C-alpha cells in the first residue's frame, strides 16, 4: 500500500510528461503543410491496408515508407479540411481528401504528436464510407513541414 502523502495532479502531469497546455507556436494552424507517418488497419477485415512506416516483413520495400504523406490543413473557423498533396493515401484511394477523423485530432495535439484512433466509416475516406468500414490508425507523427 502506498502511504506517501497525496500530491496535486500538476505534479503527476509534470512527472509523466503529459502536456496540459498546448504552446501556441507548436499548434497546427490554418494553411500549415503537415507531414504524417501512419499505419491504417481495416478493423472489419483485420488487415493492414495502407502505411508509410517500416513494418516487419516490408523492410526491403522502401517505396512503401520512404516518404511521408503530406497535406495542407485548412481551418476557416467553422469547418476544417485537409488536402493531400502527395503520399500513399492519395495513391491508394485516388482522392486528395484527408479523412475527416484525422482532422479532428489536430485541434488538440501538438507538432510531432503520436495519435492512435479508431475512425468510424462516416469520418473516414471514401472507401470506408462506401463499405461502412471503421479503420484504426496509428498515426506515428503529425509534423508541420518546414516552410
Annotate each predicted stretch with a short phrase.
Residues 2-13:
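Single conserved hydrophobic/aromatic residue that forms the stacking wall/gate
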Residues 8-10, 23-25, 40, 101, ...:
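Glycine-centered flexibility sites
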Residues 19-32:
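Short, solvent-exposed beta-strand/turn "edge" segments of beta-rich domains on protein surfaces
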Residues 30-44:
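A short beta-strand signature
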Residues 43-141, 145-146:
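A beta-strand/beta-hairpin structural motif
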Amino acid at each position: 500500500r502506498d502511504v506517501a502523502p497525496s500530491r496535486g495532479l500538476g505534479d503527476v502531469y509534470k512527472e509523466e510528461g503529459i502536456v496540459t497546455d498546448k504552446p501556441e507556436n507548436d499548434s497546427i494552424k490554418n494553411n500549415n503543410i503537415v507531414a504524417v507517418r501512419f499505419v491504417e488497419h481495416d478493423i472489419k477485415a483485420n488487415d493492414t491496408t495502407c502505411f508509410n512506416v517500416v513494418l516487419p516483413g516490408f523492410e526491403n520495400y522502401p517505396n512503401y515508407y520512404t516518404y511521408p504523406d503530406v497535406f495542407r490543413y485548412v481551418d476557416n473557423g467553422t469547418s476544417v479540411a485537409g488536402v493531400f498533396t502527395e503520399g500513399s493515401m492519395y495513391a491508394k484511394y485516388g482522392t486528395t481528401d484527408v479523412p475527416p477523423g484525422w482532422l479532428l485530432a489536430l485541434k488538440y495535439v501538438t507538432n510531432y504528436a503520436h495519435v492512435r484512433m479508431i475512425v468510424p466509416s462516416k469520418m473516414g475516406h471514401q472507401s470506408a464510407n462506401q463499405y461502412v468500414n471503421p479503420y484504426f490508425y496509428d498515426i506515428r507523427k503529425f509534423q508541420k513541414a518546414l516552410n
